[in-house]
Amino acid sequence: MTGHPRTIGIFYFSGTGNTKAVTDILATSFKEQGCAVDAIAIDEMLKNNINVEMGKYDIAGFGYPVHAFNAPRIFFEFLTLLPDGDQKKTFVFKSSGDPFMNGGSTVLVRKALHEKGYIVSSERLFVMPANVFIRYRDPLIKQLFNTAVRRGKTMVKEILLDVPRLQKNTLFSTYITAAFSALESFGARFFGKNLYVTDSCNLCGICISNCPTNNITKQKGHIRFHSKCTFCMRCIYSCPPNAISPRFLRFLVIKPWYNLQKIVSDTTVKDFHITHKTKGFFRHFYRYLSEQ
């Protein structure tokens, strides 16, 4: 491709790594088309008070994990800090553990960007392995990743060719998104406040340094959790001795946790898991998996 913009800035939030994996897929695809790419974690920008230098990018991208059919609170907090976009071309992508309702309406994210002067021309859902409720089987995890690679390449080509692709949002889906998102924001604070560490905690401090909202502290030799949690699950799944657990909603935690890159690179794991013949819960995944 020739004549397309060459500098891309991708700003993303990733709790347990799935949105980062999609970000890496998109960054690689842009680079294959001759673009220069910066991929920047928004939680690191927020924690370190780093200003957004949007003027250096021809195109800006924003990625987030779906929380209760919407972007998490920390993502919207970041959007409020953006400089004026001056009608900059923008794309949005989101990762979800299920294709149900396309991960919710994009109206609220699109509106927040529009108010800052950014024009959203492309939106995409990427279904990735779930990080709550159900531990997907390795073949499905690999199939979802490979599908994300294919969809990522298509998204990048459409962006560079100025082919618009916006998610169709119904009034119902937008209402559901707004309602569930409000409940999730409250629930996240409750969930975080009620985390605790078991006796296997070795006070390594990884959870403290990794927390995107500085919700975890060490006080008098003990790990303490507060009420700024964004429900990303990062502390639970990145704890080396698996010492962090919720007092309530324990059924949300997947055991054992999966290593995405290890599964993807394992040649013994096949990726042909869901087909048109699939029945049961995962049947509704087939339409997503068969789309470009």
Model-derived features: where do they sit?
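FMN-binding flavodoxin-like domain, especially the glycine-rich phosphate-binding loop
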Residues: 2-8, 16-22, 27-42, 50-64, ...
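Iron-sulfur cluster-binding cysteine motifs and their immediate structural context
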Residues: 196-197, 202-224, 230, 234-251
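Conserved active-site "lid/cap" helical segment
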Residues: 46
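Local sequence-structure signature of Cys/Sec-based thiol-disulfide redox active-site neighborhoods
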Residues: 8-13, 197
